[in-house]
Amino acid sequence: MNKQVEIFTDGSCLGNPGPGGYGIVMRYKQVEKTLARGYRLTTNNRMEMLAAVMALQALKEPCRVILTTDSQYVRQGITQWIHNWKLRGWKTADKKPVKNADLWQALDKETARHQVEWRWVKGHAGHRENEMCDELARQAAENPTEDDIGYQPEPQ
């Protein structure tokens, strides 16, 4: 695991649920690459998570990764909550199914391939790469092309 890659991610949702998208900025040495995709019906949290999953999946080999997100949900979920969810068979402390378990499991699998340091940055605070990701995610949400097959509407 020699290569160190910086990854910045953001998710956006126009309405929650509604059309959504993710934006990713990846940097290796001085080279930056961006990724984005829009979904017809999803949530903001799913887009935040999917951004991290897709960014890590895009790495062709195990790397040392500094992943910066403006989502406390993603950062706390993957660094703190996930351990007990796995012990409980993907149930919360009150025995309910973990929301977005499909993406938590995918993120868990991807983080196992890499050495990931999770960082949080305040959104909409002028952080260059976060602002780039936000714009990519918003543009993707405005032009959705995919179905979020894992999205499950809340029971009414």
Swiss-Prot record:
It is found in: Cytoplasm. Coiled coil: none annotated. Its EC number is 3.1.26.4. Binds 1 Mg(2+) ion per subunit. May bind a second metal ion at a regulatory site, or after substrate binding. Belongs to the RNase H family. Monomer. Endonuclease that specifically degrades the RNA of RNA-DNA hybrids. This is Ribonuclease HI. It comes from Vibrio cholerae serotype O1 (strain ATCC 39315 / El Tor Inaba N16961).
